[in-house]
Amino acid sequence: MKFAIVPVTPFQQNATVLWCEATRRAAVCDPGGDLPQILRVVEREGLTLEKILVTHGHIDHAGGVADLAEQYGIPVEGPHVDDRFWIDGMPEQSRMFGFPKVRAFTPDRWLQDGDRVTVGEATLDVIHCPGHTPGHVVFFHPESRLALVGDVLFQGSIGRTDFPKGDYDALIASIRNRLFPLGDDVRFIPGHGPMSSFGEERRFNPFVGG
């Protein structure tokens, strides 16, 4: 599986284009906005966009979902249903943060822990990782040892838990009990900032290391 990271919105959120090399079929994970930038990658690589994946319902991750799904006629998978209130509240979030007008949406498929999603011939595991938001999910591709973790974990930091229904203890448990056991060699794409690995964060991250 190949990928390209496209930082979008004033929050520089890492939208990610993922594709199966065998089929050139692709998904966009967390298209928060700036859709022309994302679609330039799709066109440059000669990809067929087949779905949208969403880690959680915050506007910088999901603000462009409704427009992209409508433009391409493609389904939306994720997050977990416990983030419905965040998605329903995106129009208000857009006013609060000064974003362009954003539409709410209903995913074609709410995801649960243990589900799988496909991109072309590739299969990603779904891991429910509450804490930053109650319905946050992580996508993990075992073959390439790659995880898309949204705002659960960052290089040297962790996701905020001071939002409605955030839970610090749940976040720490998600990282230590659901992500780190996948293996030190797993590289991850966070919602913001540079990539890292679970091994690096387990050793050096001051919030969850040691």
What does each of the following model-derived ranges do?
Residues 6-8, 100, 107-108, 128-130:
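Short Gly/Pro-enriched turn/cap motifs at secondary-structure boundaries
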Residues 1-45, 138-150:
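Conserved beta-strand hairpin/beta-sheet module of binuclear metal-dependent hydrolase folds
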Residues 3-7, 28-29, 52-55, 125-128, ...:
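Short, flexible loop segments at the rims of nucleotide/cofactor-binding pockets, characterized by
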